[in-house]
Each structure stands twice: as structure tokens, then as C-alpha cells.
Regions:
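C-terminal helical cap/extension that packs against the catalytic core
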Residues: 132, 136-141, 145-154, 165, ...
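Beta-strand->loop->alpha-helix junctions that form or flank phosphate-binding loops
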Residues: 14, 132-135, 147-166, 185-189, ...
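Hydrophobic alpha-helical packing residues
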Residues: 2-9, 68, 284, 311
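Nucleotide phosphate-binding/pyrophosphate-handling subdomain across enzymes
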Residues: 70-80, 87-98, 102-106, 116, ...
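ATP-dependent carboxylate-amine ligase catalytic core
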Residues: 6-92, 108-110
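Conserved catalytic-core segment of NTP-binding enzymes
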Residues: 84-86, 92-151, 277
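Acidic-glycine-rich active-site phosphate/pyrophosphate-binding loop
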Residues: 34-38, 162-180
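Active-site-proximal loop/hinge segments that shape catalytic or ion-binding/gating pockets
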Residues: 347
Length: 361
């Protein structure tokens, strides 16, 4: 997104869920659309749906497509909501299909094994349209789907590469090379791989849009994504991250370890009922001095009692239960010292309220 905007394109991005405001889901050049445009899109959908029942996500997907068409976006960046094969976003024919990785998540919908989940994600691969997989470990179902659909599949560390030495990194595509890349010190493997994936997708669609080393480093120097290892400096250092499964926790751990100087962390945690509590917590536990568990304002949230019991049964003794999110945020603020590190993680539904609360403090 940043690269395309830097090159002068008008870029529409559709992502989900939102953190604070619904409009965040539909952005033009990284700015959420205003209420009037969003309402006009919904009115248009209502005028033509003729009694067809639409889900919450289908409404927002159609609103995004209408908006991007009306404002004549040069590039559409569309994030799948869940899986891929049956997702509402999968009604368009893309210029390229990107799959970042496959991890155990949303098993009640996508399947209980990595290969089952891979099959659902492979559903976004379109016939005779190039596709990319951003992990060196290629699932058989993704490879097979690409073959069946005659999609030219590009795989990280097979068809494009990113490598680093002490001073900088280098990306190598099919024809192009970008060297002297200054990767942010707090990035984890996920961000590193996603950069390689983004550059490869641009080369495949239009190589003239690839940035120079100088242009890329300028972007990376100021790069941030709301709610993804977002650091907010107040009296304490607050770190907001929407990681919610063990795979994402591994990446979060790498990023926490990169912070200097090393400090133990106070972690405020909440997770949805379909998430693996212990699988998530055990990845981070030795970095955390004190766990605060709380319940989110959604019926899908684990109860605070369940979270506390799971952590204690696992062998974690320093666990405090808070009845609500705002109480947790306020109490941690009042009982930690200047420059202490506070991590808020486990879901969009805890990070969003935390961001809103911190902005009001």
C-alpha cells in the first residue's frame, strides 16, 4: 500500500476487523472514508438487493467495492475476511492472489489441520492468474490448486528471496534486486516475509512500480500499522498487538525480544473462546512478569474466570483478574512505574478499546 501510494497511485484498501471506527475498513490512500460516502454505499446496496439477505461482512465488502469504483482507485488491496474459498471478497478476479502463510486458526470454520486450512485459503487462487505464497513451507493443497487452475505460483525462498547480513537486507525477485534495505530493528519474521511478499507481488503485476532502495528505506523508516506492535509512549510504554494465536504470538515474541533494553513486561490479555489460551500464553510467559486477564465486551470472549484458571493451572502464579477492560487499563496504569512496558494483546476486541482509551488519556 505505502509503495503504491508513494508511486502516485490512488489505492483503495479493504481490511477487517476495525479497531476503533468502522470506517477504518475502507480506506483511500490510508485514510478512512467519511460517514456520508459509507452511508451512500449502504443506501445503494439496499436499493438493489431486492430482498436478498446479506451478512454484516457482505455489506461492508460491497460498500468497499462500490467506493473504490466510484473514486476510480488505481489499485485495490482486498483482504479476505475468513479462509478464502467461500469468502465474500472472492467474487472478483484479481490481478494477483497473495497467501501470507497457513496457521491453525478459526478451526471450527476452516478445518482442524494445516492442509485443510490451506485448501480453504487456496480458494482465492484464480484460473490463469498469478499467485504468491509467503512462506518457504508450501502446503500440498496450495500447490495442487495452483496447478489445477494453471496459476503461476511464486513461493518465498524458491522463486523470490530476502536475506540479511549485519548491516542491511537484500530482496531478489525474478528479475529485479533491491539491496541495502534497512529493516526496522523491531520487526519479526512475519514482517520480514511480508515485505518480500509485497515486493514480489509488485514485480509480477508491474515491475516499474518497484521502489529503489532509497524510496523503500524512506518508507520503512516511518512504517507502522495500527494495532500491530503499535508502541504508544505515555508515562509507561504501551505496546498494542492484535496477535491471537500461537503462530502470531511467536512473531510477537521476536519483536518484544528486539526492544532495548530488555525489561520484563506487564501483559493485559483477553482471548476469544475459540482461541488456544495456553498455546498463546506459553510462547510469551517467560517475558512477562505479571499477567492481567479480563473479559471483552462480546459474548465470544473467554470469561475472566476461565482465563485466570487456565493460567494458574498451567503454573503461572502472578495472575490478576479484572472485571472489565477499562478497569484493567486504569489499574495497570496506576500500579506500574514510569517507563515500564505494558503489552495489550489477544484480540482486536481488546486492542481497539485500549487504543481509544490511551488516546483519551
Amino acid at each position: 500500500e505505502d509503495i503504491l501510494i508513494q508511486k502516485g497511485l490512488r489505492v483503495g484498501s479493504y481490511t477487517s476487523p476495525h479497531l476503533v471506527d468502522y470506517n477504518e475498513r475502507i480506506c483511500i490512500n490510508k485514510l478512512p472514508i467519511d460517514d456520508s460516502r459509507l452511508i451512500d454505499s449502504f443506501k445503494l446496496i439496499e436499493s438493489v438487493r431486492e430482498g436478498i439477505l446479506l451478512t454484516y461482512f457482505e455489506y461492508s465488502t460491497l460498500a468497499a467495492f462500490i467506493t473504490f469504483n466510484q473514486v476510480d482507485c488505481d489499485a485495490w488491496l482486498i483482504e479476505v475476511g475468513l479462509g478464502g474459498r467461500l469468502d465474500a471478497t472472492n467474487i472478483i478476479t484479481p490481478s494477483i492472489s497473495l497467501i501470507t502463510n497457513v496457521a491453525l486458526d478459526h478451526q471450527e470454520w476452516l478445518g482442524t489441520s494445516l492442509e485443510e486450512i490451506a485448501k480453504e485459503k487456496a480458494g482465492i487462487i484464480s484460473a490463469k492468474i498469478p499467485s504468491i505464497f509467503g512462506d518457504p513451507s508450501l502446503p500440498k493443497n496450495i500447490e495442487q490448486t495452483a496447478l489445477e487452475k494453471e496459476s503461476d505460483l511464486h513461493v518465498l525462498s524458491r522463486d523470490f528471496f530476502i536475506s540479511s547480513n549485519c548491516d542491511s537486507s537484500e530482496w531478489q525477485g525474478k528479475y529485479a534486486v533491491i539491496d541495502s534495505i534497512m529493516i526496522p530493528s523491531h520487526w519479526g519474521p512475519g514482517e520480514y516475509h511480508n515485505l518480500a511478499l509485497s515486493l514480489a507481488s509488485i514485480e509480477i503485476v508491474d515491475s516499474e512500480l518497484l521502489p529503489s532502495s532509497k524510496e523503500l528505506n524512506c518508507l520503512l523508516n516511518n512504517f507502522s500499522v495500527s494495532g500491530r506492535f503499535e508502541i504508544i509512549e505515555k508515562k509507561q510504554t504501551w505496546i498494542l498487538d492484535v496477535a491471537h494465536n500461537p503462530h502470531a504470538a511467536e512473531n510477537l515474541r521476536k519483536r518484544l525480544e528486539s526492544l532495548d533494553p530488555y525489561k520484563k513486561i506487564t501483559a493485559i490479555l483477553s482471548l476469544m473462546q475459540d482461541k488456544d489460551i495456553i498455546g498463546f500464553v506459553k510462547v510469551l510467559d517467560d517475558l512477562v512478569a505479571h499477567w492481567i486477564v479480563c473479559e471483552m465486551d462480546t459474548p465470544r470472549s473467554h470469561s475472566v474466570q476461565t482465563l485466570q484458571k487456565k493460567l494458574i493451572d498451567y503454573g503461572i502464579s502472578n495472575v490478576t483478574a479484572e472485571s472489565g477492560l477499562l478497569e484493567a487499563f486504569s489499574n495497570v496504569k496506576n500500579h506500574t512505574k514510569k517507563n515500564d512496558r505494558i503489552l495489550i494483546t489477544g484480540s482486536f476486541e481488546i486492542v481497539g478499546p485500549a487504543k481509544k482509551w490511551l488516546n483519551s488519556e
